[in-house]
A protein has these predicted regions:
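Sec-exported extracytoplasmic/periplasmic mature domains
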Residues: 76-84, 119-123, 170-174, 184, ...
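Caspase-like (clan CD) cysteine peptidase catalytic core
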Residues: 111-134, 138-191, 296
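Active-site-proximal C-terminal subdomain of hydrolase catalytic domains
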Residues: 176-308
Length: 328
């Protein structure tokens, strides 16, 4: 009888460990969302003079028309969903918008300020940290970099190495969801450079190389494009009054997955961490049930337009994907 019992227990254990592990949820826990968006609006005559010691000096940096719309509305969509589901959350917007920002503001998105804001977070291991970036990205020696602002010159002449960003996010010490809308953003995974195009449909692409096992927390990374693709701004929203609004191809569809409704007449206001108010054009129509990054990736991949011409979204994660929105 004892042999039979242990045999049954062993079989049950095998069945259990062979099943997919449920997605982690953050119900009852705190969510901190950091939104970084840059429009690269020229601010002075020599704004694009490029110091020769910076890697991005050989790249063309043009103004982006959709990044601020993307940043404000994605943040508002998350904030609205968390509020609806009674999830404790904090919103941190780091935006470089227009031709006269406050360069002295600690939320101005220089590379130093971004890392400093992340490093100052005090979260528990069961909390969730969501990081979103909308801006220019470039590759140099197989490394991904983001072009950030410089407060001393009021220009764009600093760069943030993706691996440094990942180190900072890992050190927060909790589960994290990283969403990047930038050219070549799939380069977050060094293996991706050898991944055939036909494999990008896999929902189980494993993101391991950039994970420091010292921490061991769950991390999901959703990238707008593969390592060798640009991230386009061709998602145009037309309003009834004839006005229009530009979004990134990736974030436009990301907002759709979050049931965001674009509107000029009905806006959403979100309080930033410094007490200022961020106004987004539109509102959330609500999300029934939970929404994981796996769910979002599947929707983005299935709804991509002209897949041979536009970019492919890419998803990496350690062990399990993460619920961006909880069930209730």
């Amino acid at each position: 009888m004892r042999k039979t019992f242990f045999l049954v227990a062993f079989v049950v254990l095998l069945v259990f460990i062979s099943c997919d592990t449920p997605f982690f949820s953050h119900e009852g826990q705190k969510v901190t969302v950091m939104i970084v968006g840059l429009d690269y609006e020229p601010r002075q005559k020599d704004v694009f003079d490029k110091p020769i010691d910076l890697k991005w000096s050989s790249y063309s940096v043009g103004k982006l028309l959709g990044t601020i719309n993307d940043s404000k509305e994605f943040g508002a969509a998350l904030s609205s969903s968390y509020k609806e589901k009674n999830v404790d959350n904090q919103m941190i917007f780091m935006l470089s918008e227009g031709d006269s920002p406050d360069y002295s503001n600690p939320l101005y998105p220089t590379a130093t300020n971004i890392i400093s804001q992340i490093s100052s977070l005090e979260l528990d291991e069961d909390d969730l940290f969501v990081f979103y970036y909308a801006g220019h990205g470039f590759l140099e020696d197989d490394e991904l970099y983001f072009i950030t602002a410089d407060k001393s010159l009021g220009s764009f002449c600093t760069e943030l190495k993706a691996s440094y960003l990942m180190d900072a996010i890992e050190s927060v010490g909790c589960r994290s969801a990283v969403i990047i809308d930038a050219c070549y953003s799939g380069a977050f995974d060094p293996k991706n450079s050898s991944t055939p195009n036909t494999l990008t449909n896999s929902l189980k692409s494993i993101f391991k190389e950039n994970i420091n096992t010292e921490y061991g927390y769950q991390m999901s990374v959703l990238a707008a494009s593969k390592w060798n693709e640009k991230s386009l701004e061709n998602y145009n929203v037309l309003f009834n009054d004839g006005n229009s609004e530009i979004h990134g191809h990736f974030t436009g569809r990301l907002l759709s997955a979050l049931n965001w409704r674009h509107s000029l007449s009905k806006t959403t206001t979100v309080e930033n961490s410094d007490g200022t108010m961020i106004v987004a054009n539109g509102y959330s129509s609500g999300i029934v049930g939970s929404l994981s990054l796996d769910d979002i990736y599947s929707k983005l991949f299935d709804e991509r337009d002209y897949p041979d011409l536009y970019q492919y979204p890419v998803l990496y994660y350690t062990n399990e994907s993460i619920n961006l929105i909880p069930a209730n």
